[in-house]
Design a protein with these regions (language model features):
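Active-site rim beta-loop-alpha module in soluble metabolic enzymes
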Residues: 126-170
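Metabolite-binding pocket within alpha/beta catalytic cores that recognizes anionic/polar moieties
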Residues: 1-123
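His/Asp/Glu-rich mid-to-C-terminal helical/loop segments that flank catalytic regions of hydrolases
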Residues: 205-246
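Zn-dependent metallopeptidase/amidohydrolase metal-coordination segment
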Residues: 178-216
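Short, flexible loop segments at the rims of nucleotide/cofactor-binding pockets, characterized by
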Residues: 54-59, 153-155, 173
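Generic hydrophobic/aromatic pocket-lining and core-packing "Φ" positions
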Residues: 67, 165, 181-184
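Short acidic/polar active-site loop segments enriched in Thr and Asp
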Residues: 76-77, 174, 193
């Protein structure tokens, strides 16, 4: 089963048949709501990353509980949605990027299931190539899509400074967000295939002279919700049930 992690706005009850709403207890805390739905003959689990009322800021999201809970309900592949700031010269608002790698600038987040034993998980290919391919195909018919890129994750909840963005760009970052890590790493530890669709909502700090407020960003994200739903719908249909990735 494919799991979708994203904002509450990408869930459209009109286009799916709701089968169940599950509250999942985990060793890391309870996950109050995972919706199991069916569309086009496939069951999908939807988890609102920021909670039912979108009230949990990025640095307070219980990433371990979320990934653990999805595994418990039978998810073996995840499609994550991320609104990001564009850093790369080739990106502009409205573009879609499917990342192949990430940079981690978070701090203090619970980022592993292996606190009590020594385990070194390979993340040389952190994003599942088969889910990435499904996302690339789905997004390519809807928007301008970049099939490779590096996602840089910062701690939040504040926006980055222009100097921080220059540093991230120098290190190879193409987009910046606040939620993709440790989510991708935890999925890897649980042997769940993981792919991300990044929607460029704005230029990152210092890339454009225009300043962006949190309210404006929220409005831009809402404007992109319909596009994200279409990409996810297409991708879910194209993700192979049996994947060959390691």
């Amino acid at each position: 089963m494919i799991g979708i992690i994203g904002g509450t706005g990408i869930y459209d009850p009109k286009s799916v048949k709701e089968i169940a709403v599950k509250e999942v207890e985990t060793p890391y805390g309870d996950v109050p709501e995972i919706k199991i739905v069916e569309f086009n003959g496939k069951q999908v689990a939807f988890l609102p990353r920021h909670g039912k009322s979108h009230a949990i800021p990025p640095h307070r999201v219980n990433y371990r509980a979320n990934i653990y809970a999805l595994k418990e309900v039978g998810v073996d592949g995840i499609i994550s949605t991320n609104s990001v700031g564009g850093i790369g010269d080739f990106l502009k608002p409205g573009d879609v990027m499917i990342p192949h790698d990430f940079l981690d600038f978070t701090r203090g987040r619970e980022s592993t299931f292996y606190d009590d034993r020594v385990v070194h998980v390979d993340v040389s290919s952190p994003y599942c190539p088969e889910i990435r391919n499904a996302l690339i195909r789905a997004a390519g018919s809807i928007s301008k899509v970049f099939s490779n890129g590096v996602y840089a994750c910062t701690q939040g909840p504040r926006f980055e400074t222009p100097s921080e963005i220059r540093m991230i760009k120098t290190l190879g970052g193409d987009v910046v967000g606040m939620t993709g890590v440790p989510e991708v790493v935890l999925a890897r530890e649980k042997e769940i295939c993981y792919g991300s669709v990044c929607i460029v909502a704005n230029f990152a700090a210092g890339i454009s002279e225009e300043k962006l407020t949190a309210t404006e960003l929220t409005e831009i994200v809402k404007e992109n919700e319909a596009m994200v739903r279409k990409i996810i719908t297409g991708a879910v249909e194209n993700v192979p049930e049996h994947r060959k990735c390691e």
